[in-house]
């Protein structure tokens, strides 16, 4: 019985670590893309990474909290994305955010 409980605890811990690694990987991937497109310096890249990681963590939290309530989940996720834009705009400036928006629009056409 003790082994079973220990195994269950280890599985939960492992799943959390894997999920965190996945979020870190997503944040790194999008940060690298933004850095390449906008030619960010090291400080800007660090800020973008932190903003993106927090965004992904918030999204996971909201999806877990409202998994059975799509009507509430949708507006909560929209709030996260609006805050994301504001934080990125504050960190990078209006011109770079416009450049990023233009890039996203362009790749959307392809």
PLM segments and residue spans:
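Charge-rich (acidic/polar
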Residues: 19-110
């Amino acid at each position: 019985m003790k082994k079973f409980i220990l195994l269950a605890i280890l599985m939960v811990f492992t799943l959390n670590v894997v999920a965190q690694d996945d979020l870190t990987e997503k944040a790194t991937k999008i940060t690298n893309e933004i850095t390449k497109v906008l030619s960010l310096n090291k400080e800007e890249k660090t800020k973008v990474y932190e903003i993106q990681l927090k965004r992904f963590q918030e999204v996971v939290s909201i999806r877990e909290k409202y998994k059975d309530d799509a009507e509430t989940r949708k507006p909560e996720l929209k709030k996260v994305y609006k805050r994301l834009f504001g934080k990125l705009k504050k960190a990078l400036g209006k011109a770079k955010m416009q450049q990023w928006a233009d890039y996203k629009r362009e790749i959307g056409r392809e």
